[in-house]
UniProtKB/Swiss-Prot annotation:
Activity regulation summary: Allosterically activated by HslU binding.
Location(s) in or outside the cell: Cytoplasm
Class of this enzyme: hydrolase
Name of this protein: ATP-dependent protease subunit HslV
Amino acid sequence: MTTIITVRKGGKVVMAGDGQVSLGQTVMKGNARKVRRIGKGEVIAGFAGATADAFTLLERLEKKLEQYPGQLMRAAVELAKDWRTDKYLRNLEAMMLVADKSITLAITGNGDVLEPEHGTTAIGSGGNFAFAAARALMDTDKSAEEIARRALEIAADICVYTNHNIVVESLDVEG
């Protein structure tokens, strides 16, 4: 699996993810890019789970963003509706974090669209470790990027399905 984290602090929203792709007990690739910009560069998306499934969902989200430009929440809800009701999509095994300048959302395969509190959230095999680390660092003077990187490093030290090859994307937030 993998670990993806997002941190919103100090005028920035940062998303970071590791690069490990595992097949069972084997590391197949160490430098996959699971965090990327979509929606004309206005949205950051990160995924955990089956890679092909995640790409399918990213493509669907991009289409929803074209349909509802500048409305990340609406696009995410419409994607979640499709994900939950479509016979093919319902079987996809992936989760996504998405963020734009004003909102961060976690989109699950159950059709949930969740807006995290406390300025941070994480998904994937090391998500709970990264989330706990980020929560502990939110009250420090560290920047959003420093928190995201350190939280992922801690998760990678603990979770065998997360590595230290970290990719970071960031956006300036409204404020």
